[in-house]
Swiss-Prot record:
Coiled coil segments of this chain: none
Its biological purpose: Could be part of a binding-protein-dependent transport system for phosphate; probably responsible for the translocation of the substrate across the membrane.
Residue span(s) of domain ABC transmembrane type-1: 70-285, 413-623
Protein name, per record: Phosphate transport system permease protein PstA homolog
GO CC annotation: plasma membrane
Length: 651
């Protein structure tokens, strides 16, 4: 009897020990990630180290001031954040309060498409379309910081819209009902009550969107080319210049011909600065909005208010002007027997107030419609640009979509598919085990908070930092390349992208497990079912739909990435196909054409962009429609379909 109990305990505990071991290894990965960055950054020479806090940037002269690239990064990020927050929040209000749920669901799918578009396609659109608008319509330099601000604003709009929409949908409906019953109109309630109710969430959204903007690298490289910071700033042409951001400086000089070990150390130092900055922003956003934190540190409310006021300075002042114009200033508040002779004045003032309230409401709705048209119009514009021009490029004689040679789009697609299959095979079991341990086994709040912070930090990490880690660890240390420490390989790209998507996959798997009703677990435990059996027979089957969607979203993320592959897998494919040899993906094929002197470079970009967009739209269709539709079928429906198929075969 004792032996049976022991054997059953061993069977029950093996999953716990395995998942716990994998979780600890993941934590060690995070620590080693930072250590390898520090080791490479330590190679910075004394001359470069002294110049980091100086005001001169010239890598050839061993001058590497951090301030100018960081200033450019902050300026373009704040500029894009102001535009994106204005458009995004008003579009969210339009979706939640002006659209029916069915229409809202379809429009949010369009936003999902925008969020899934690879950054290199944004860069291509900016150089081909936005640059023409700046040059021909606005009569401004086509490739400038202003172009980058507009491009980045539409890149971060999906974050603002999706998170703000989610926050608005979770506001208690009683707030709207009570305020309207007190005499306020719907629009006034939205902007004066509900918007203030989600103010804390809006600050978090702004911080997350800012982190996304400041970490963008590859799209920015399509536009910004200069590092002559002192000359440009001295000539007072900052916004019309093409000065590089901090992230684009890293990607530009990481494989520079004149780059040595010290230059590489400087770039790793820049990467650590971005890493620390993004981690701090995410930690501050989550920590500062907790009720207990706000009670203990009241000054955090002032900081949140300051961030909110800076970003919303112009919209708030315009809104305050209209509020002032439409404010009630009735001299006669109420008609009684004592002032019945003033009834004419009372009705006149009330009609004027109602008219001004209608003006206020119309102005707000007009802004919402305008912002929604801008957001969805941009998606339509970029899709039409890719489909029309990409289709024309494919029809030309030089198209390589259906070729699989060395320098072809077909070969890039094959490389991308191989990377997806191997990376998913590596990351999914690891992510699922960690999610099971966090969700089903561990009871420690400290452990959960620690892993939550690590996962959030790694999820928000700029992909260029992962590329630096892959270069340092997989190529220079493990030498997973046929070319040795100085080479690139598909295997290094696969392992690097596995590290990139692992935190995202852990979080989505955890959400899928959380969506399984806890009542099912409790009922099973009450019947004497072991935890291992509950996980295998109840939790995992119940979470199957969410896990499949998590896999599809992860594949989407892999396709959209560029920076990790650019650094670890290379910009070109080798003559032979081998995981130890370099190979370009769809996105690095687009990016690689920036350095090509071939006259067909733009056509190659367009045809590859079309293949990428079609692939991504297919995945979004799977995750948003097909998978939920299939899982909505019950057993009886499947039997009906089976019987119809059998009858069809007999006929």
């Amino acid at each position: 009897m004792k032996q049976k109990i022991k054997s059953r305990l061993k069977k029950d505990n093996w999953l716990r020990y395995l998942s716990q071991t994998v979780a600890v290894c993941f934590l060690l990965l995070f620590i080693s990630f930072f250590i390898f960055l520090l080791i490479e950054a330590a190679k910075t020479g004394p001359d470069f180290t002294k110049s980091l806090l100086g005001l001169e940037f010239n890598l050839g002269a061993k001058k590497a001031s951090i301030w100018f690239p960081l200033l450019v990064s902050f300026v373009v990020s704040i500029g894009s954040l102001i535009i994106a927050s204005y458009i995004g929040v008003r579009t969210s209000i339009f979706l939640v309060y002006r659209c029916k749920p069915r229409i809202r669901k379809k429009l949010l799918l369009v936003i999902d498409i925008l969020s899934g578009i690879p950054s290199v396609i944004f860069g291509l659109f900016a150089t081909q379309i936005l640059s023409s608008i700046f040059r021909d319509v606005l009569h401004l330099p086509p490739l400038s910081l202003l172009n980058v601000i507009v491009m980045l604003s539409f890149m971060i709009i999906p974050i603002v819209i999706s998170l703000t929409t989610n926050a608005l949908l979770h506001v208690e409906s009683s707030l709207m009902t009570v305020a309207i019953s007190l005499g306020e109109n719907k629009t006034s309630v939205i902007y004066k009550v509900i918007k203030k109710e989600i103010k804390a969430q809006l600050v978090v959204i702004l911080v997350l969107a800012f982190g996304r903007a400041i970490s963008e690298t590859m799209a920015v490289n399509f536009i910004l080319q200069s590092v002559n910071y002192q000359e440009v700033i001295a000539n007072d042409r900052f916004f019309t210049s093409d000065l590089k951001t901090l992230g684009s400086v890293i990607s530009t000089f990481i494989f520079s011909e004149n780059g040595d070990e010290q230059v590489s150390g400087v770039l790793y130092t820049f990467g650590i600065i971005i890493f620390v900055l993004i981690s701090f922003l995410n930690f501050f956003a989550i920590w500062s909005t907790r009720p207990k934190t706000l009670e203990r540190y009241p000054f955090l409310k002032k900081i949140s208010n300051f961030i909110y006021q800076v970003v919303w300075f112009i919209p708030n002042n315009i809104g305050a002007l209209f509020t002032d114009l439409t404010a009630r200033r009735q001299q006669v508040k109420k008609i009684t027997a004592a002032n019945v002779e003033q009834r004419a004045t009372f009705f006149k003032e009330r009609m004027q107030t109602n008219h001004l309230n209608k003006v206020y409401t119309s102005w707000k709705i007009l802004q919402e419609i305008f912002c929604a048209v801008l957001a969805f119009g941009f998606v339509l514009g970029i899709l039409l640009f890719v489909f029309i021009n990409g289709s024309q490029a494919i029809q030309r004689s030089g198209s390589t979509v259906f070729s699989f040679g060395v320098d072809t789009t077909g070969r890039a697609l094959v490389n991308t598919l191989v990377i997806i299959l191997v990376a998913i095979g590596i990351t999914f079991p690891i992510a699922l085990l960690i999610a099971i341990w966090l969700n089903e086994y561990t009871k420690s709040r400290i452990a959960k908070n620690t892993f939550s912070f690590v996962i959030d930090s790694l999820s928000s990490m700029p992909s260029i930092i992962y590329g630096l880690f892959g270069l340092s660890f997989f190529l220079r240390t493990l030498q997973l390349s046929a070319g040795g420490a100085n080479g690139t390989s598909l295997m290094a790209g696969i392992l690097t992208i596995s590290v990139v998507v692992l935190p995202f996959l852990i979080r989505t798997c955890q959400e899928a497990l959380n969506n399984v009703s806890w009542d099912l677990r409790v009922s099973a435990y009450a019947l004497g079912v072991s935890k291992r059996e509950v996980i295998w027979k109840i939790v995992l089957p119940g979470a199957l739909k969410g896990l499949i969607i998590a896999l599809i979203l992860t594949i989407n993320r892999i396709i959209a990435e560029t920076a990790p592959f650019f650094i670890t897998a290379g910009l070109a494919s080798s003559n032979l196909f081998d995981l130890s040899l370099p190979g370009q993906t769809l996105t690095t094929r687009i990016y690689g054409q920036l350095f090509s002197t071939n006259s067909t470079a733009v056509d190659v970009m367009l045809e590859t962009a079309l293949v990428s967009i079609v692939f991504l739209m297919f995945l979004i269709f799977l995750s948003s429609y097909l998978i939920p539709y299939l899982f909505s079928f019950n057993k009886q429906k499947w039997l009906q379909i089976k019987s119809k198929l059998q009858l069809w075969k007999k006929a």
